[in-house]
Amino acid sequence: MKNKIFLAIFLLMLTIGNAHALDNSKVLSENGVTIPLVADRITDNGEEGAILNAQVIVKNGTGHVFIDTSPYTQVDLQGSTRIAAMVASDVLGIDQKSYDFYYIIEVDSPIIGGPSAGGALTVATIAAINNWQIKPGVVMTGTIDPDEAIGPVGGIPFKLEAAATENTTLFLVPQGQLIVNITNVTMTRRGIADHSVNTVDLNELGKKLGITVKEVSTIQDAVLEFTGHDIRKQSTNKTVFTANYLNLLEPLALQLANESKNMYNNTAFIDNDLIKNALDLQNQADGLANNKKYYAATSLYFQSMVNILTSQWEYQYDHERDKDQYITNLINTVEKQIQNSENDLDKFKSNGISDVEVVGAAESRIMEASNILEDVKNLNNTKDVISRLAFANERARTAQWWLTLFVPSGKIIPEDVLKDRSGWYLSQAQSVSTYIQSLISGNGGPIIDKGDITLVQKEIKRGYYSGAIFDSLRIISSSSTVIKLLEVQDPSARINQSAKAAEIAINEARSEGIEPTLAVSIYEHGEILTNPFAKMSQYSYAKMVAKTTESLYSHALPSNETIKPDITIPIVNRSITPITDKKSPAFEAIILIIVILVIRRLKN
């Protein structure tokens, strides 16, 4: 009875919410769509599949996600609905904060979990937004990743058998899971569990059950099978690295090349691994610059300068009498650099935010440098203190570098829009990381360092809303990459898929008159990485940044700001000279007397 009352109130809220919709909003179906879900559950006879029904309704609103389940389900199903709403909006290029999403799921008995329903829920959300019908007889299992991929799940044979009881004709599974292993557990007479593994060919099992089994890799593939509508976007022949982008980055790369090499030449007398590594990094960066990978080159020049500055400061520390005062002076130096970068950023933003990516990149780097400076006070090891201070100093300088990459857009994004979105994206990042953590619980420690979330919270508190948005996206992309690579033997196909999605998103932004410099630079950095996780994470991040930037500019206002501000990178004197141990005159006289006495004795 209570559930019926709640459902009545729930549906009444939908009606009221729709009554207040804007006149120019999209007309959405009152009843939404209903889609079958498959899950697995534990019974007295062991693991078995279960068929559920989900009703998905989308109304004009403010970005909220509501879920009504009976009985209460685990956090992973709730997380699946949040991801479904986010991905559906992303795929269709709509503003998620203009809609509210309602998921009504009836569960006959407790299920093991709900992540495998994510793909189907996303399909239903896309169908509800477009008023499309769901084909009868189609059932799907698979998680949904924030970058639109269908992820692997367990218990597929049991789910396939359950689907067969509901007149299913087509059963969709994640790519790479046509053949799966099932662990059977039987108890011996002595009460000992006996484990055996069976390999199941789902195509063969499907034939026995009269069902076609088919793989899908992306949500676009799944939507086509469920609705007949093809929303896949073809990769264009347009390059990611346009002449405008290369011309923008080249001067910065050349300036950093000169600065880092001058630093090395003035410090080469210090013979340690940091200096040797700095030279190697410069050589690698030169090669990248010659191949017009200017942003990737600047990243290596940056690392080189951090190494050299660390060596310089360590060398000077070793030769200082008052070492405590020297560390205090270094802290003051870094504080001054951070303040200079903050002042440049404030001046840059004084006329409004016209290039949100450049501002976001600068804000993120200033906040990171400030955070490191805070943490240094808790370190006891002097070498760690010096190396972290050197990194913080150079990281703060990169904010100034980014401001030189400004591209006038002729538009200003209102601060209240950025403030509102920063809180929303932080909430999304927290939800995604919690959701994905629930999927791999027991397989290791936390995916995302709590410090990453804390940093975003500090950015919002400080008014660095653009930086908070892009740092939240980085958390989301890192979290989603973890699940994408789970149990994947050869990640190359998924990496290529992520790269292609990023390429499409970047060129879509350009088609709207936006130059997504940050997104392209992230993509470029991903190209030089070799670690599969890091590479895929960068491509996923690049795509999210490009799409989010496009969304933010949809709220921009016209501006007369078309002239690039006069911003230059300050030239910093990094030269040091070898320090020789000073001897007192008396000491030198004693040495001379000893030499004379030795000579006289030899003559005798």
Language model: regions and residue ranges:
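Sec-dependent signal peptide cleavage junction
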Residues: 16-23, 578-583
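Peripheral, non-AAA+ core regions of ATP-driven protein-machinery
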Residues: 21-290, 297-298, 314-316, 328-363, ...
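Long, charged/polar, soluble alpha-helical segments
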Residues: 207-209, 216-585, 599
